[in-house]
């Protein structure tokens, strides 16, 4: 055991070595490294597997009751400050190590197939290994300074991975948005760390928490200053875990590849903020005001994320807002003092959310050959439907993840979410109502996604006329294409450029050639016939003059004679889905808070015994009492599921091929349509931020530019111009001619006489009037 603890440094070093090896090889020997792309993936997976084995061993030692352990080295020391680096092993660390490594290795196995077509395959694995290493280093850090170092590395890796397809403007903008938004939180976190050290004189987490509590108890610190430092510390986790109002980066982060979306939302970046609050729990709990702020921020975030997810049509963005909502629960729990419930939900949510995201990636991977490689189509649920028939394993695992996230027993998230709901009612009726309503909304929007995606009829081979204005975008391959906005996505009049074998380019409807050439060849389509149809228009100056009949004949050949349907994903992707489905089913039982015949089943409470909270149970309740307390949370979730079933499920009489959301015209319909628009457009919060921050910054910049150009430069340039003309005037006055001097002297004397005469007349007139 001692040897295992002393070698804990191997856990973050293994993926770091993999990242550096692959990255340096790609930098110095790009061709050779790319030719060994599968070897690079195997190295990354193997080294992370070593880290996972050590993590599980440490977790087992913690379950057996072995004491916590710190491994420290002196980094910086003088008479005023002492700073150490090292590793901290405690129950929270061990659970997070297992979560990060297990989810990370399954994401890597999944990525081997998902990213196999991508030219950035090797670069992706280098980033992925560095991302995992950074999160593992953060989890093992014993002090806030070391946490901050790895915190920034996690942010940097998220920037690289969100913008992985940087040739797409949307991806480039998304990674910048995530980076800048998190800079706000990171700046607050840095100030909070410095302020905390100024108050306590220590960087060690346990020492500063104890000193801080002692100072609060003895009134040795100003409460306003203490709360200010605590809120600054909380600003970092609020941004990292996408808490309101710093949540706006999260849905745009879906521009990255789906495997990294799973890792960000399940076990790394979003989890980092919750982990930090849990790590600093004893520091925060000394300040009731700060705890109240944390709980309300979490509650508002949970409800806001759930309401925005209601009308999303992008599958990944719907899951992204679900991620925003669930960490809201996790932030609410420590805010009300329920440390155990927050840590428990962090674990159960990681596997469920990773399963859902990888399931969505499997769907997208199968939809791309049919509807095209644009995210606006391949991720749009309007094109899906009935996928369970063609992708039974993906559909089943996605359903398991959906049931878990909705809090349906006996799946993983039920046990943790129900505990948060019960504790919320105990702490505050308002927070209880918020958490309870959010649970109902979660059941609705999650099953809305499931029904629209996996039930009904497949809609990917259908197209409809669209008269709405189209919007341009750039696909991952860099081709400029067009897509219609929100509702009418099946377009016959959106065009893309196409090149025939002779090298000439034509604009053809995008939905005609949305299939990749390899899939068309597999269906034995006569591509040469299509080229011959277009060849008659080869000499036309206007490429838009291509006959509509040409498109109709090509479209009929593709759509009517060779209709394509999705296929189940590769075995490596299915292996990850099935592997994640296992903890989604069973991991919740480690925290079941009841005992039977003297046998305690709540391993999590025993594991977190040193960190008990005000809601810690004595494990004396039986199974019947526990399920009676869970009736309200399960009931509201089932209400949401039922409403979703009747609107979007197989019993729905609406034609989901035309519009997946119902439309009505009465007052109630107006209300729901307004709510739908509010949800679809993200509560207009992004628009508000654009007006306040982006447009406001532009207006301020233009105002400052105007002031600088016309006022500051005007004063400086005006003085220069006056000096110039004054000098010119004096230069002409010194011509060297005596008549000119005499003329000037006479004119000057005359002017002086005139001034004296006028002055004397004014004085005499004044004296005359004063006599009376």
UniProtKB/Swiss-Prot annotation:
One of its GO terms (cellular component) is chloroplast thylakoid membrane. It comes from the Eukaryota. Pfam families: Proton_antipo_C, Proton_antipo_M, Proton_antipo_N. Its EC number is 7.1.1.-. It is a multi-pass membrane protein. It is found in: Plastid, Chloroplast thylakoid membrane. Keywords: Chloroplast, Membrane, NAD, NADP, Plastid, Plastoquinone, Quinone, Thylakoid, Translocase, Transmembrane, Transmembrane helix, Transport. Its main location: plastid. The chain crosses the membrane at residues 8-28, 39-59, 87-107, 120-140, 147-167, 185-205, 219-239, 258-278, 291-311, 395-415, 425-445, 574-594, 631-651, 710-730, 738-758. InterPro entries: NADH_UbQ_OxRdtase_chlpt_su5_C (IPR002128), NADHpl_OxRdtase_5_subgr (IPR018393), ND/Mrp_TM (IPR001750), NU5C-like (IPR003945), Proton_antipo_N (IPR001516). One of its GO terms (molecular function) is quinone binding. NDH shuttles electrons from NAD(P)H:plastoquinone, via FMN and iron-sulfur (Fe-S) centers, to quinones in the photosynthetic chain and possibly in a chloroplast respiratory chain. The immediate electron acceptor for the enzyme in this species is believed to be plastoquinone. Couples the redox reaction to proton translocation, and thus conserves the redox energy in a proton gradient. NDH is composed of at least 16 different subunits, 5 of which are encoded in the nucleus. PANTHER family: NADH-UBIQUINONE OXIDOREDUCTASE CHAIN 5. Belongs to the complex I subunit 5 family. NCBIfam families: NDH_I_L, PRK06590.1. This is NAD(P)H-quinone oxidoreductase subunit 5, chloroplastic. It comes from Angiopteris evecta (Mule's foot fern). The lineage of its organism: Eukaryota, Viridiplantae, Streptophyta, Embryophyta, Tracheophyta.
């Amino acid at each position: 055991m001692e040897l295992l603890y002393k070698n804990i440094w191997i856990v973050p070093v293994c993926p770091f070595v993999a990242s550096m090896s692959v990255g340096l090889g790609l930098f110095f020997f790009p061709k050779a490294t790319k030719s060994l792309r599968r070897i690079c993936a195997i190295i990354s997976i193997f080294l992370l597997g070593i880290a996972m084995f050590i993590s599980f061993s440490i977790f087992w030692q913690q379950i057996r009751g072995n004491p916590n352990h710190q491994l420290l080295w002196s980094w910086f020391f003088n008479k005023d400050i002492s700073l150490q680096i090292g590793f901290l092993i405690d129950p929270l660390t061990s659970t997070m190590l297992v979560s990060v490594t297990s989810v990370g290795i399954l994401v890597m196995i999944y990525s081997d197939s998902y990213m196999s077509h991508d030219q950035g395959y090797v670069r992706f694995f280098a980033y992925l290994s560095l991302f995992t290493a950074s999160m593992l280093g953060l989890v093992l850090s014993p002090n806030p300074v070391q946490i901050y170092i790895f915190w920034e590395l996690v942010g940097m890796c998220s920037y690289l991975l969100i913008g992985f397809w940087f040739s797409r403007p949307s991806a480039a903008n998304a990674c910048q948005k995530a980076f800048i938004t998190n800079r706000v939180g990171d700046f607050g976190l840095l100030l909070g760390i410095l302020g905390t050290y100024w108050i306590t004189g220590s960087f060690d987490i346990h020492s500063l928490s104890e000193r801080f509590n002692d100072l609060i108890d003895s009134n040795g610190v100003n409460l306003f200053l203490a709360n200010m430092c605590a809120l600054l510390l909380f600003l970092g986790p609020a941004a990292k875990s996408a808490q309101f109002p710093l949540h706006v980066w999260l849905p745009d982060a879906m521009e990255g590849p789906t495997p990294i979306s799973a890792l960000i939302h399940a076990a790394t970046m979003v989890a980092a903020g919750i982990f930090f609050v849990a790590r600093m729990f004893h520091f925060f709990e000394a300040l009731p005001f700060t705890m109240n702020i944390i709980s309300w921020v979490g509650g508002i975030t949970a409800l806001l994320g759930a309401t925005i997810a209601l009308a999303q049509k992008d599958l990944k963005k719907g899951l992204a807002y679900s991620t925003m909502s669930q960490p809201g629960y996790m932030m609410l729990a420590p805010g009300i003092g329920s440390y155990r419930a927050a840590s428990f939900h962090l674990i159960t949510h990681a596997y469920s959310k990773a399963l859902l995201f990888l399931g969505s990636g499997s769907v997208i991977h199968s939809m791309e050959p049919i509807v095209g490689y644009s995210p606006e189509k391949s991720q749009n649920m309007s094109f899906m439907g009935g996928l369970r028939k063609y992708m039974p394993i993906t559909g089943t695992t996605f359903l398991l993840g959906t049931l878990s996230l909705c809090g349906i027993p006996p799946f993983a998230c039920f046990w943790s979410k129900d505990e948060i709901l019960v504790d919320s009612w105990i702490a505050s009726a308002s927070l209880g109502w918020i958490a309870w309503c959010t649970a109902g909304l979660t059941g609705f929007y999650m099953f809305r996604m499931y029904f629209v995606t996996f039930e009904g009829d497949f809609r990917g081979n259908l197209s409809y006329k669209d008269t709405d204005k189209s919007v341009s975008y750039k696909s991952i391959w860099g081709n400029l294409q067009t897509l219609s906005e929100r509702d009418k996505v099946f377009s016959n009049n959106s065009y893309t450029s196409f090149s025939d074998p002779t090298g000439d380019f034509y604009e053809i409807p995008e939905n005609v050639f949305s299939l990749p050439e390899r899939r068309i060849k597999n269906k034995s389509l006569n591509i040469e016939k299509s080229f011959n149809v277009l060849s008659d228009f080869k000499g036309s100056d206007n490429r838009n003059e291509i006959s509509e009949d040409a498109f109709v004949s090509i479209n009929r050949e593709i759509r009517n004679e060779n209709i394509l349907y999705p296929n189940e994903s590769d075995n490596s992707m299915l292996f990850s889905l099935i592997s994640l489905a296992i903890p989604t089913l069973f991991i919740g039982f480690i925290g079941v808070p009841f005992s039977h015949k003297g046998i305690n089943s709540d391993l999590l409470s025993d594991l977190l015994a040193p960190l008990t909270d005000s809601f810690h149970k004595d494990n004396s309740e039986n199974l019947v009492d526990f399920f009676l307390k869970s009736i309200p949370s399960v009931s509201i979730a089932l209400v949401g599921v039922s409403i979703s079933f009747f609107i979007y499920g197989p019993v729905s009489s609406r034609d989901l091929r035309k519009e997946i959301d119902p439309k009505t015209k009465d007052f109630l319909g107006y209300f729901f349509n307004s709510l739908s628009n509010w949800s679809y457009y993200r509560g207009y919060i992004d628009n508000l931020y654009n007006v306040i921050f982006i447009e406001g910054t532009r207006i301020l910049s233009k105002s400052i530019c105007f002031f600088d150009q016309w006022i500051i430069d005007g004063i400086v340039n005006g003085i220069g111009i006056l000096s110039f003309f004054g000098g010119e005037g004096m230069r002409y006055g010194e011509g060297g001619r005596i008549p000119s001097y005499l003329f000037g002297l006479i004119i000057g004397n005359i002017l002086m006489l005139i001034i004296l005469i006028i002055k004397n007349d004014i004085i005499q007139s004044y004296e005359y009037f004063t006599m009376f």
